[in-house]
Curated annotation (Swiss-Prot):
Name of the featured protein: C4-dicarboxylate-binding protein DctB
The species this protein was found in: Bacillus subtilis (strain 168)
Pfam families, per the entry: DctP
UniProt record, GO biological process: transmembrane transport
Function: Part of the binding-protein-dependent transport system for uptake of C4-dicarboxylates. Responsible for growth on fumarate and succinate but not malate. Is not directly involved in C4-dicarboxylate uptake, but plays a sensory role in the DctS/DctR two-component system which regulates the expression of the dctA C4-dicarboxylate transporter.
Matching InterPro entries: DctP_fam, TRAP_DctP, TRAP_DctP_sf
């Protein structure tokens, strides 16, 4: 019996030794091989970019282009994770998320920034810009600089301005040709007192609601209509639940790409260089592509929907401007006479 137990013990010891030697040969004496993806993940930095619109919009496409350029310029060492359609934060939540460090990049509509600094409301004034050249001149010049400077007190850093386009009006309550046609209508608008006051001036009842709730509000007849760019009307299919579209171009819709100042300063000079270069190239692309996209998608709406479309003539736009001019006087004490003057000068030049 003892000899049997001894034999068993020797066998177990032999097996254990063989296993150890085999394991050692495969791991201890050889370097573990990583594929390219695994190697990249060992030192990859990941930043989050949250926005609330669809990917097939000027902002959605710009965010993805920025991510691609950062990946390319960093050799895969910096990854921008893009969260579209409000999948991470709503347009009401994203600024706080940025300040809390839960996300590193956002691109809220400029209308949202009035809650941080009232001067941002100047971009919501009716017919603030009358064409894309005026937008570029204003935001790439003194007006854009002043607005980004106003964010510093909130420890936020403005990186770029991205354009969506000019806002149009959709409704189920008959064609909108004159300012009086909006009287008595309930309209969904962005969070902006300036926008609210201009629609009240025309006799409408504006409702400040989140962007991603708009389709449901229209579908359930909670509101009669809304204002938005062609790109947003197309991507969110508002034309399926609205009967009339007026090409009024009465307001500008754009975005301020932002990050947190503390986050930015914590990055290495090389990381900041890569992010800055990628943002510059993306912004130049957006300035050209946004205008083209809105034109193309208007043609798609014309071809593929039953919505009735009316385009204001230049003479009719002048009538709308005249009716809405009191909003400029109302907000001059808040925005400052100089900022208003610069905006009106751009209107003259365009």
């Amino acid at each position: 019996m003892k000899s049997l137990l001894a034999c068993l013990a020797l066998m177990i010891a032999g097996i254990a030794t063989a296993l150890f030697i085999g394991f050692h040969d495969h791991t201890g004496n050889k370097k573990i091989v990583y594929d390219d993806d695994q190697e990249g993940l060992q030192d990859q930095i990941v930043f989050k970019f949250s926005h609330v619109v669809a990917e097939n919009t000027p902002k959605g496409l710009a965010a993805n282009k920025f991510a691609d350029l950062v990946n390319e310029k960093s050799g895969g060492k910096i990854k921008i994770e893009v969260f579209p359609n409000g999948s991470l934060y709503s347009d009401i939540e994203e600024i706080e998320a940025l300040q809390n460090g839960d996300v590193q990049f956002i691109a809220p509509s400029t209308s949202k920034l009035g809650m941080l600094s009232p001067e941002w409301g100047v971009l919501d004034l009716p017919y603030a810009f009358t064409d894309y050249n005026a937008v570029k001149k204003g935001l790439n010049g003194s007006i854009g600089t002043q607005l980004f400077d106003s964010l510093k007190k909130n420890q936020l850093k403005g990186l770029a301005y991205w354009t969506n386009g000019f806002k149009q009006i959709t409704t189920n309550q008959g064609p909108v040709k004159t300012p009086d046609d909006l009287k008595g209508q309930d309209l969904r608008i962005m969070q902006s007192d300036v926008i609210e006051d201009q629609f009240k001036l025309l006799g409408a009842t504006p409702h400040q609601e989140s962007f991603n709730s708009t389709f449901q509000l229209l579908e359930n007849n909670v509101v009669d209509g809304e204002e938005n760019t062609i790109s947003n009307i197309y991507s969110k299919k508002f034309y399926n639940v609205q009967d009339y579209l007026t090409i009024s171009s009465h307001g500008y819709l754009g975005y301020a790409v932002m990050t947190d100042e503390h986050f930015w300063k914590a990055q290495t000079p090389e990381t900041r260089r890569i992010l800055t270069e990628a943002m510059k190239e993306t912004t130049e692309w957006n300035e050209t592509y946004a205008e083209q996209m809105n034109k193309e998608q208007l043609e798609e709406i014309k071809k593929n929907s039953a919505i009735h479309i009316y385009e204001l003539s230049d003479k009719e736009k002048q009538e709308w401007m005249k009716r809405l001019d009191p909003v400029y006087r109302q907000y001059e004490p808040i925005f400052g006479r100089e900022l208003i003057r610069e905006l009106l000068e751009l209107r003259k030049d365009s």
